């Protein structure tokens, strides 16, 4: 069970931080008077950074890219299943990635329904739940698990390294751009990073 310790640690950090978001400095300072935790900190960061439409569009594109990456490994796993005629014979790295991707989907839907914090701005779909940043969670988790997968399935070392570096770059840009885009509070991003670390470490523990 030691191999799950790091994942459990980040998961616990996420739970504790979420509780703090619900109870510390909760004020009706959000969009349409919605309640937000860490109100002083969140509103100060939002006023400092404002909104950035380019950053928002970039993270939307990163999200599509992450889904395509997940789809590539899903297709690879399906082809292995057809060829080897047994789910147990599909590479463990791909099977475990599938489990983590399933968890991402479940958590994505769950957090969209649980309104812990609302967005600082109202988008086309009206007032939306914003904690944690599920966009950040999706991109970081998928690309974070893609890094070891790239090392295994891309035979050209230079190409594999390039793909890994691109994944890391996009992960970093996602955190920065999602924050400066203005569609999330600062604590939303922190929550998204914490749950991503939990899922990425879980994937490594499952291998």
Predicted regions and their residues:
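Hydrophobic, lipid-facing residues on alpha-helical transmembrane segments of integral membrane proteins
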Residues: 8, 12-16, 95-110, 141-145, ...
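Alpha-helical membrane-inserting segments
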Residues: 17, 45-46, 78, 107, ...
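Membrane-interface loops
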Residues: 29-30, 78-161
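Membrane-water interface of alpha-helical transmembrane segments
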Residues: 4, 53-63, 91-96, 157-164, ...
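Membrane-helix interfacial "entry" motifs
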Residues: 52-59, 85, 89, 93, ...
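Membrane-embedded catalytic cores of phosphoryl/pyrophosphoryl-handling enzymes
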Residues: 3-6, 21-22, 123-207
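Lipid-exposed faces of alpha-helical membrane segments in multi-pass integral membrane proteins
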Residues: 12, 65-75, 99, 103-107, ...
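N-terminal transmembrane-helix/juxtamembrane module of multi-pass inner/ER membrane proteins
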Residues: 1-69, 112-123
């Amino acid at each position: 069970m030691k191999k799950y310790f790091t994942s459990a640690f980040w998961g616990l950090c996420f739970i504790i931080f979420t509780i703090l978001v619900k109870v510390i400095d909760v004020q009706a300072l959000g969009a349409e008077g919605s309640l937000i935790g860490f109100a002083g900190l969140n509103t100060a960061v939002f006023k400092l950074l404002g909104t950035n439409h380019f950053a928002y569009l970039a993270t939307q594109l990163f999200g599509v890219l992450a889904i395509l990456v997940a789809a590539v490994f899903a297709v690879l796993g399906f082809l292995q299943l057809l060829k080897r005629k047994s789910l147990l014979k599909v590479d463990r790295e791909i099977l475990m990635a599938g489990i983590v991707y399933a968890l991402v989907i479940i958590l994505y839907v769950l957090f969209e329904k649980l309104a812990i914090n609302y967005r600082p701005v109202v988008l086309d779909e009206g007032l939306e739940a914003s904690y944690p940043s599920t966009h950040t969670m999706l991109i970081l988790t998928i690309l974070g698990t893609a890094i070891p997968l790239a090392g295994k399935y891309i035979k050209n070392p230079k190409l594999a390294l390039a793909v890994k570096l691109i994944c890391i770059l996009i992960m970093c840009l996602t955190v920065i751009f999602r924050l400066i885009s203005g569609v999330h509070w600062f604590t939303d991003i922190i929550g998204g990073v914490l749950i991503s670390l939990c899922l990425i470490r879980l994937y490594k523990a499952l291998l």
